[in-house]
Swiss-Prot record:
Record's function text: NDH-1 shuttles electrons from NADH, via FMN and iron-sulfur (Fe-S) centers, to quinones in the respiratory chain. The immediate electron acceptor for the enzyme in this species is believed to be ubiquinone. Couples the redox reaction to proton translocation (for every two electrons transferred, four hydrogen ions are translocated across the cytoplasmic membrane), and thus conserves the redox energy in a proton gradient.
Family named by the database record: Belongs to the complex I subunit 2 family.
Broad enzyme group: translocase
Catalytic activity line of the entry: a quinone + NADH + 5 H(+)(in) = a quinol + NAD(+) + 4 H(+)(out)
UniProt signal peptide: none
HAMAP family in the cross-refs: NDH1_NuoN_1 (MF_00445)
Gene Ontology biological-process entries: ATP synthesis coupled electron transport
A single cellular component GO annotation: plasma membrane
Assembly, per entry: NDH-1 is composed of 14 different subunits. Subunits NuoA, H, J, K, L, M, N constitute the membrane sector of the complex.
Protein name: NADH-quinone oxidoreductase subunit N
Membrane topology note: Multi-pass membrane protein
UniProt KW keywords: Cell inner membrane, Cell membrane, Membrane, NAD, Quinone, Translocase, Transmembrane, Transmembrane helix, Transport, Ubiquinone
Pfam families: Proton_antipo_M
Length: 460
């Protein structure tokens, strides 16, 4: 049951050991680590599909087919982030610091444990492991003041949210007498009495998950962290980390708040609406492409929360499918920027992509496909994700959520189209020659293929 987590932890620690011992061989060790991480995917697919439970006087840890799928998807995006860091270090001429790969792997271990946790305290500890490594990943560029500033904001706000989360756990134990998901589920759904203290405890605990999702109003850290963090860290935060947070939320939703108390339901609904509003409007005035993508993430997390609020199996599937499609599109966009700008990617803005279509037609076309998918143009995968999500919302008579989703999608189309306009209709002062990176090229090829043909594969 714990084989994927054990394998990943050993891979991280042993790889770091060999990276220290074999000075100057970091790139070789990185390639071996990536191969071992790919092996972990096969371990997940082979040994984690059957339902099993770990007991330590009570249920602490569980796995099943859904959880195994989540872990496999997260690990795929983790591997992509590792490849991006490896190739970016080559293109930028910076030395490959193996600690980065170790931190990403340990963060993923925390996500894995959190997804399988059946106890609030275990879930908190797992999320803290992910949070602590994420703070370091955000501030990994020690020479960059913006990186340090973003990491410091991330750490301070994250620490505050962790305190709220622990405060919520104390409420849960005090009013519920247990930290087990199953026990709290029973008490929350006991129609004979409404335990307001228990509801408050759950809501306080959920604040840590909403912070990790960068959903409004807990989103203010995201633009600064995205702007200052290394591009490989940003890809990890946008894809693997966000998918993990959504999986944790769906796990809690299934076991604890399937029948929402009105307080928690309305609170999550407000968070979804605020995320859509802040995400759509906040991105309009941005000039930095990384800050723009931070607001885009906030907006799209609002869409994901629509699926969570529906409280149905189809709603959960719609939420995770949409998150997967958005994560793939974001990865594709960032890899295009790296291929185009090299060591200037971390300072990418609209001026950086002016007129690139004239000299770099393939990259411009790839970005076009990605932007159209984010807008939701058929028959791209982004259209399928939005259609499925909004259709489920309308079916469940959540008209306000659906209307807000459609309205903010129209607003978001403005800045996605602005990127396309800048590439094709602005003049590029000095054309640059781009060296080929086969790792990034392969990632982009897979992403574009998924966005183009994913809707046909998924619908069939």
């Amino acid at each position: 049951m714990l084989l994927p987590e054990i394998t990943l932890t050993l891979t991280a620690l042993l790889s770091q050991f060999f990276a220290v011992m074999l000075q100057g061989k970091n790139r070789i060790v990185a390639n071996i680590t990536i191969l071992l991480t790919i092996l972990t995917i096969f371990i997940i697919l082979k040994y984690s599909y059957s339902e099993s439970v770990l007991y330590l006087d009570y249920v602490m840890f569980t796995t099943n087919a859904n959880i195994a799928n989540y872990k496999a998807i997260i690990l795929i995006f983790t591997i992509i982030s590792m490849i991006i860091y490896r190739d970016y270090s080559v293109r930028s001429g910076e030395p490959l610091k193996f600690e980065f790969i170790t931190l990403i792997l340990l963060s993923t271990v925390g996500i894995f444990v959190a997804i399988s946790a059946q106890n609030f305290l275990l879930l908190f500890c797992a999320m803290e492991l992910t949070a602590l490594t994420s703070y370091i990943l955000a501030g990994f560029k020690l020479s960059d003041i913006k990186s340090s500033e973003g990491a410091l904001k991330y750490f301070i706000l994250g620490s505050l949210v962790s305190c709220l989360s622990l405060f919520g756990i104390s409420f849960i134990y005090g009013f519920g007498g247990s930290l087990q998901f199953s026990d709290i589920f029973y008490k929350l759904n006991d129609s004979s009495s409404v335990n307001l203290g228990l509801v408050i405890g759950v809501v306080l605990f959920l604040s840590s998950i909403f912070f990790k999702l960068s959903s409004a109003p807990l989103h203010f850290w995201a633009p600064d962290v995205y702007e200052g963090s290394p591009i490989a860290s940003v890809t990890y935060f946008t894809a693997a980390s966000k998918i993990g947070a959504v999986a944790i939320l769906l796990n809690i939703e299934n076991l604890i708040i399937k029948n929402y108390h009105p307080i928690s339901y309305n609170l999550i609904k407000i968070i979804a609406l605020l995320s859509m509003i802040f995400g759509a409007l906040g991105a309009i005035r941005q000039t930095s492409l990384k800050r723009l993508m931070a607001y885009s993430t906030i907006l799209n997390i609002g869409y994901v929360l629509i699926g969570v609020l529906l409280r149905t199996e189809d709603g959960n599937k719609a939420a995770m499918l949409y998150m997967l499609i958005y994560a793939a599109a974001s990865i594709g966009f960032f890899t295009c920027l790296i291929m185009l700008l090299g060591n200037q990617t971390d300072k990418a803005n609209f001026e950086s992509i002016q007129g690139i279509a004239e000299n770099h037609k393939a990259i411009a076309a790839a970005i076009c496909i990605i932007m159209f998918s984010m807008i939701g143009i058929p028959p791209l995968a982004g259209f399928l994700g939005k259609y499925y999500l909004f259709y489920q919302a309308i079916t469940q008579e959540e008209f306000l959520l659906a209307y807000f989703g459609i309205f903010t999608s129209v607003i978001a189309a403005f800045y996605y189209l602005k990127i396309i306009k800048t590439m094709y209709f602005a003049e590029k002062p000095n054309p640059t020659k781009i060296p080929i990176s086969y790792g990034l090229l392969l990632i982009n090829f897979v992403v574009i293929g998924f966005l183009l043909f994913g809707s046909f594969i998924i619908s069939s």
